[in-house]
From Swiss-Prot:
Identification of the protein by name: Oxidoreductase NAD-binding domain-containing protein 1
Swiss-Prot/TrEMBL keywords: NAD, Oxidoreductase
Gene label: oxnad1
EC number: 1.-.-.-
Gene3D superfamilies: Nucleotide-binding domain of ferredoxin-NADP reductase (FNR) module, Translation factors
A Pfam family recorded for this sequence: NAD_binding_1
InterPro entries (UniProt xref): FAD-bd_FR_type, FNR_nucleotide-bd, Oxidoreductase_NAD-binding, OxRdtase_FAD/NAD-bd, Riboflavin_synthase-like_b-brl
Length: 270
């Protein structure tokens, strides 16, 4: 989710479930994820703060009237281990994103409130599912959180008692420089090639694709044929996040493979 447009985030998500409590947070690191995206690490010290993989935060900035809405791109495991969450925010003139890119610094104080009905939070008694994650542009953020959570579940099966099946990520961007988190995504696929796979799609790549990305990268949009290969109507649970036209096209393609509509979950970014 993004606060990219002028449409008010709180108004747009008024009917969506969110927590009641606001939590103070401190910016403890800022990383340039790409030429246009900054990744913030926020320390949230309160022991009651929690979120599910895929959810977003209302983002309150002192002195800025507009409230932002940004998907959490880190896993619940990072919060448990280090007391931190991460947000990856693309540059925009919308006040919260503009503040992050032009004024935010380490030790800046903000406040966050968790919300969203789009998440992956399996319980030990749930049936095993294969995950199909389909992202367009910065729609990768909540899906990256879900991917990291799935990887954590595979690493720590002894403590959670739920292990997902196979996870495949389809991630489309204009070019390879705009593919966020690509190195970590590839590392996860290398770590457990039996459980994780990915395809990067580039739609406006003008240069040669870097050698290390070539095995994973396809020129052109995500196709119905690729989706078909990763769909089992009885096991697959699909999460989509991206611009509305992509969501509509991919949802239609998935339903044509026989995947039930209630197994296709999506969040549109504006």
């Amino acid at each position: 989710m993004t606060s990219r447009r002028r449409t008010d985030h709180l108004e747009r998500t008024a009917s969506v479930h969110r927590q009641m409590e606001l939590f103070s947070a401190r910016v403890c690191d800022i990383i340039s994820e790409s030429d246009t995206v900054k990744r913030l690490r926020l320390e949230v010290a309160h022991p009651d703060f929690s979120f599910r993989a895929g959810q977003w935060v209302d983002f309150f900035i002192p002195g800025v009237d507009t409230v932002g809405g940004f998907s959490i791109c880190s896993s619940p495991g990072l919060l448990k281990r280090e007391g931190a969450i991460e947000l990856a925010v693309k540059y925009a003139r919308h006040p919260p994103a503009h503040w992050i890119h032009t004024e935010c610094s380490v030790d800046s104080q903000v406040a966050v409130r968790v919300g969203g009905n789009f998440y992956f939070d399996p319980q030990p008694s749930n049936p095993v599912v294969d995950l199909l994650l389909v992202a367009g542009g910065v729609g990768i953020n909540p899906l990256y959180s879900i991917l990291l959570h799935a990887a954590d579940l595979h690493r720590h099966t002894h403590s959670h008692r739920y292990t997902p099946g196979h996870t495949h990520l389809c991630y489309s961007a204009k070019n390879t420089t705009e593919l966020l988190f690509k190195d970590t995504i590839i590392d996860i696929c290398h770590e457990r090639p039996d459980k994780f796979s990915c395809h990067f799609h580039v739609t406006q790549q003008s240069s040669d694709i870097e050698p290390q990305l070539q095995p994973y990268t396809i020129r052109g949009r995500i196709s119905a044929e690729e989706l078909q290969r990763y769909v089992d109507p009885e096991r697959t649970l699909c999460y989509l996040c991206g611009p509305p036209p992509m969501i509509e096209k991919v949802s239609s393609d998935l339903q044509s493979t026989g995947l039930p509509e209630d197994r296709i979950l999506f969040e549109k970014w504006w």
